[in-house]
């Protein structure tokens, strides 16, 4: 067997060759290639004239000496047109009911059936057996069929509660395609002179029969780690609890997991990774509503749970809460304390600043950030003389929030312990402290917990970086996952700096 990374590189080059001359169809080609390499079926939904049939024709070139069968279904299609005509000679001479299958579906590796939902019951029943068992009953004999990929297409979905649902359930990958959208791609498509029948794949990249058979065994050996299974089970439970979620059979889950194994194998990995689970969005939907629902659920899973993002934020919240508790216990030691000077016959006490507050400008830290004047405030800068006047005579006190801009009016008081307390509009208050106490405000146990959490974050980010190579996942997903991890990392770093 080729080295995993060499195999991944080869499959990437093979896909690039198949995509040549097809515009905005890279994702569809890659998923159809994955389906072909793992022996699964694909349903393409979209209007006429958007290269659905060309996608299927291209996949034939992925294999050496592959045979293709293509047919447009109508209400009048007969089994003979799909599975081959009856042998008049065998029926006449030997009384045998036998089809001549050369050139028809039973002898093709790549099959494309357009307008699939127009097929009659006789075709559908035989097709179900072909998909499920890869066998075709030809008269008295069961013949094995070589089909590696079935691509079915239509511009509509099957009607609910119809006889077509059984066949629809067998189509593991479901892709909703549209016209070419980008202006440059549209122009390139219009002026392209490429012959659709040309083989764009070098012989060195084509898959041999021996390779294909060996890969089927290798795919089954790809492991499903417990953490990845837990993510899958979480998704299954979420879908079961949502009122409008599609029904997903156990058979479909099992086939989907094999597709994830194939994704891991052809990406050069020996185990399914969380990144592979994104493929489930193309496997578990039924209609437009469930397609959007699956997109949302997978985004929640990938950006919130797959790399422990939400769990790390929950831990961070617990650490911050514990730090606040410890800081509250130590607040009397760190809080800025003024000196009471008022006599017993004074109508109100007055205060003076302690000796250590001798600078002309004083910066005092909020022990807990507050939102003041629509700003998140962590420190306030006072003019020393203005603060002394307020401590002596009361009245209005102003300070620069975070040391910037004009001095703003503050709701500030001296509490019973002679500490300065500033309050926000909801009257939530926090004590002020000298900057020198800030470094000592974070207990050692909190520092250690934050260090451990940051190390865990680095491990998760490294895991994502190592696993993100997956040909079959759109790059947009990688950007969203990276952003979610960076957000967690930034919150941890901010907590360490507070």
Swiss-Prot record:
Transmembrane segments: none annotated. It is an enzyme of class 3 (hydrolase). It catalyses: ATP + H2O = ADP + phosphate + H(+). GO terms for cellular component: cytosol. The keyword Metal-binding does not apply. GO terms for molecular function: ATP binding; ATP hydrolysis activity. It is found in: Cytoplasm. CDD domains: AAA. Its EC number is 3.6.1.-. ATPase activity is stimulated by ViaA. Keywords: ATP-binding, Chaperone, Cytoplasm, Hydrolase, Nucleotide-binding. ADP binds at residues 23, 49-54, 196. Its main location: cytoplasm. InterPro entries: AAA+_ATPase (IPR003593), ATPase_RavA (IPR023671), ATPase_RavA_C (IPR022547), MoxR (IPR045427), P-loop_NTPase (IPR027417), RavA-like_AAA_lid (IPR041538), RavA_ATPases (IPR050513), RavA_LARA_dom (IPR046898). Pfam families: AAA_lid_8, ATPase_RavA_C, bpMoxR, LARA_dom. The keyword Nucleotide-binding applies. It comes from the Bacteria. Homohexamer. Interacts with ViaA. Component of the RavA-ViaA chaperone complex, which may act on the membrane to optimize the function of some of the respiratory chains. RavA functions as an ATPase. NCBIfam families: PRK13531.1. Belongs to the RavA family. This is Regulatory ATPase RavA. It comes from Salmonella typhimurium (strain LT2 / SGSC1412 / ATCC 700720). The lineage of its organism: Bacteria, Pseudomonadati, Pseudomonadota, Gammaproteobacteria, Enterobacterales. The gene is ravA.
């Amino acid at each position: 067997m080729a080295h995993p990374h060499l195999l991944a590189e080869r499959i990437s080059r093979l896909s690039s060759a198949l995509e040549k001359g097809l515009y905005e169809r890279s994702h569809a080609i890659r998923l159809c290639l994955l389906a072909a390499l793992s022996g699964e079926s694909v349903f393409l939904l979209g209007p006429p004239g958007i290269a659905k049939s060309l996608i299927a024709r291209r996949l034939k070139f992925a294999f050496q000496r592959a045979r293709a069968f293509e047919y447009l279904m109508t209400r009048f299609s007969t089994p003979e047109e799909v599975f081959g005509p009856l042998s008049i000679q065998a029926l006449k001479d030997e009384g045998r009911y036998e089809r001549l299958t050369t050139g028809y579906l039973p002898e093709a590796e790549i099959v494309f059936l357009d307008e699939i939902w127009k097929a009659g019951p006789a075709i559908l029943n035989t097709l179900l057996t072909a998909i499920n068992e890869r066998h075709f009953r030809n008269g008295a004999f069961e013949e094995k069929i070589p089909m590696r990929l079935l691509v079915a297409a239509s511009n509509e979905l099957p009607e609910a509660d119809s006889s077509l649902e059984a066949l629809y359930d067998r189509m593991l990958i479901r892709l909703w395609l549209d016209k070419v959208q980008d202006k440059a791609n549209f122009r390139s498509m219009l002026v392209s002179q490429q012959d659709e029948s040309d083989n764009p794949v070098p012989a060195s990249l084509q898959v041999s029969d021996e390779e294909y058979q060996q890969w089927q065994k290798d795919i089954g050996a790809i492991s499903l780690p417990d953490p990845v299974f837990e993510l899958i089970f979480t998704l299954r439970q979420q879908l079961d609890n949502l009122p409008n979620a599609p029904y997903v059979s156990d058979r479909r889950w099992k086939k989907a997991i094999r597709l994830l194994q194939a994704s891991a194998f052809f990406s050069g990995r020996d185990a399914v990774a969380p990144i592979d689970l994104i493929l489930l969005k193309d496997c578990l939907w039924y209609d437009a509503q469930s397609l959007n629902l699956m997109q949302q659920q997978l985004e929640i899973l990938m950006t919130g749970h797959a790399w422990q993002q939400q769990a790390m934020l929950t831990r961070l919240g617990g650490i911050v809460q514990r730090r606040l508790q410890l800081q509250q216990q130590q607040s009397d030691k760190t809080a800025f304390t003024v000196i009471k000077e008022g006599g017993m016959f004074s109508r109100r006490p007055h205060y003076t600043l302690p000796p250590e507050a001798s600078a002309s400008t004083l910066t005092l830290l909020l022990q807990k950030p507050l939102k003041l004047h629509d700003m998140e405030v962590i420190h306030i800068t006072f003019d020393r003389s203005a603060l002394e006047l307020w401590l002596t005579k009361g009245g209005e006190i102003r300070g620069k929030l975070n040391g910037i801009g004009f001095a703003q009016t503050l709701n500030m008081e001296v509490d019973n312990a002679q500490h300065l307390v500033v309050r926000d509009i909801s009257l939530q208050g926090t004590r002020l402290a000298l900057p020198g106490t800030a470094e000592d405000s974070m207990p050692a146990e909190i520092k250690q917990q934050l260090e451990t959490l940051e190390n865990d974050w680095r491990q998760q980010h490294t895991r994502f970086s190592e696993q993100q190579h997956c040909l079959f996942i759109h790059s947009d997903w990688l950007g969203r996952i990276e952003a979610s991890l960076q957000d967690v990392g930034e919150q941890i770093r901010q907590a360490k700096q507070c």
